């Protein structure tokens, strides 16, 4: 069985789930799977994927896992008590061949947000591992280890990068569970203090690493349906987050509606309240410069704020960003696929995104148009109008 612990997921799933329990327990949502890599035939592996998901739905949190979560300063006791009773229910997920007949598969997750939020990361990890164990029956781990050593060597070679730290954000697109663990341990041993930690809660617990994460796009997307007014949905999301965490976990995600809309909403109050912001699409250098100017315009010293970069990073790009912004702000870097799925094979570009909440379409209009995903073009047009966002030339939202 690929997934053997419900902690084998990203920390931000639990931080968002706690907000859902306390503020949106009645919300119903729908997620859909998409493979952005052309020409990939997943249909032959559909039974294996279903079997693995069935195994996932048999898991419960152990007392050791619950105690670990309880010790986190921002996790509340009633949430842990809820998790003690929790398991994923197979009735909320369907996995079928796409009617297009092109090798794609349809994965639909539909049900109460509180009971479906933990599906996304392990299901993506399952699809990845099932695909690669069938297509690469003798993985070239030697090549993977050599590539990983070169990355560690590159980052650790120059003294001026001694304070440049990276984190593992690679659970969802990892080559395999075994390889992911080896990567995390190799980074810990090879980078020392330059390895900030991991988004994976299971490996953080098992190997005493720092678990990292705050919020994901789905949280702010759901607020489109849960907030009082669509135009205020991003502000509403930030306010509800602050109401739950009272200044903790203060990294705001910036690209659900694009950078312009984010800066319009992220006013002086939020600049002072939140610790920083996370970049996940668009030009990271331009984004960073705009964030620093925005902080200065709102009477905040940028050197006290954190800029988190997490969009398709590799080590050379991390180093370039560090050189640009060092000493101007605090920095954090989350590296995903380039760490956990770089053995010389083409990684799958797969996602599971929320598309509806309480029966209403929800969408992400990021700074990288190809990352947008919504099944309702009329709603997308309305959302753009509300937030004053131009129609991108290469919009692929209906694909």
Curated annotation (Swiss-Prot):
PTM sites of type Phosphohistidine: 217
Keywords on record: Ligase, Phosphoprotein, Pyridine nucleotide biosynthesis
Superkingdom, taxonomy of origin: Bacteria
GO molecular function: nicotinate phosphoribosyltransferase activity
Enzyme Commission identifier(s): 6.3.4.21
GO cellular component: cytosol
Pathway named in the protein's UniProt entry: Cofactor biosynthesis; NAD(+) biosynthesis; nicotinate D-ribonucleotide from nicotinate: step 1/1
Key word Ligase present: yes
UniProt catalytic activity: nicotinate + 5-phospho-alpha-D-ribose 1-diphosphate + ATP + H2O = nicotinate beta-D-ribonucleotide + ADP + phosphate + diphosphate
The keyword Ligase appears for this protein: yes
GO biological processes: NAD biosynthetic process via the salvage pathway
PTM comment text: Transiently phosphorylated on a His residue during the reaction cycle. Phosphorylation strongly increases the affinity for substrates and increases the rate of nicotinate D-ribonucleotide production. Dephosphorylation regenerates the low-affinity form of the enzyme, leading to product release.
Major enzyme class: ligase
InterPro entries registered for this protein in UniProt: N/Namide_PRibTrfase (IPR041525), NAPRTase_N (IPR040727), Nic_PRibTrfase (IPR006406), Nic_PRibTrfase-Fam (IPR007229), Nicotinate_pribotase-like_C (IPR036068)
Family per similarity comment: Belongs to the NAPRTase family.
Function of the protein: Catalyzes the synthesis of beta-nicotinate D-ribonucleotide from nicotinate and 5-phospho-D-ribose 1-phosphate at the expense of ATP.
The protein's name: Nicotinate phosphoribosyltransferase
Organism: Burkholderia ambifaria (strain MC40-6)
């Amino acid at each position: 069985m690929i997934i053997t612990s419900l902690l084998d997921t990203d920390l931000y799933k639990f931080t968002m789930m706690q907000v859902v329990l306390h503020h949106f327990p009645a919300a119903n949502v729908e997620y859909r799977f998409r493979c952005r890599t052309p020409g990939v035939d997943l249909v032959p592996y559909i039974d294996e994927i279903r079997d693995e998901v069935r195994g996932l739905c048999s898991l419960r949190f152990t007392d050791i896992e619950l105690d670990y979560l309880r010790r986190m300063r921002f996790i509340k006791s009633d949430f842990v008590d809820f998790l003690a009773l929790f398991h994923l229910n197979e009735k909320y997920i369907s996995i079928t061949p796409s009617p297009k007949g092109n090798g794609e598969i349809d994965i639909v997750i539909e049900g109460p947000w509180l009971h479906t939020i933990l599906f996304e990361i392990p299901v993506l990890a399952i699809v990845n591992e099932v695909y690669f164990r069938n297509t690469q029956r003798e993985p070239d781990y030697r090549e993977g280890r050599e590539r990983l050593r070169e990355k560690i060597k590159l980052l650790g070679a120059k003294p001026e990068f001694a304070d440049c730290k990276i984190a593992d954000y690679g659970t969802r697109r990892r080559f395999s569970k075994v390889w992911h663990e080896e990567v995390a341990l190799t980074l810990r041993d090879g980078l020392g203090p330059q390895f900030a930690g991991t988004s994976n809660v299971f490996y953080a617990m098992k190997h005493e690493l720092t678990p990292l994460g705050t919020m994901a796009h789905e949280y702010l997307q759901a607020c489109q349906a849960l907030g009082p007014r669509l135009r205020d949905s991003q502000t509403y999301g930030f306010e509800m987050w602050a109401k739950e965490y009272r200044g903790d976990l203060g990294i705001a995600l910036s690209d659900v509606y694009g950078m312009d809309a984010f800066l319009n909403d992220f006013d002086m109050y939020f600049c002072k309240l939140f610790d920083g912001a996370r970049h996940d699409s668009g030009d990271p250098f331009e984004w960073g410069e705009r964030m620093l100017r925005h902080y200065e315009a709102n009477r905040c010293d940028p050197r006290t704020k954190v800029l988190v970069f997490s969009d398709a990073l590799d080590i050379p790009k991390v180093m370039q960003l560090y050189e640009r912004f060092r000493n101007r702000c605090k920095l954090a870097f989350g590296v995903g696929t380039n760490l956990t799925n770089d053995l010389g094979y083409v990684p799958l570009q797969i996602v599971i995104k929320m598309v509806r909440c309480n029966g209403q379409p929800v969408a992400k209009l990021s700074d990288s148009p190809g990352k947008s995903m919504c099944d309702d073009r009329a709603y997308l047009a309305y959302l753009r109008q509300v937030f004053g966002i131009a129609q991108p030339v290469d919009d692929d939202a209906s694909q």
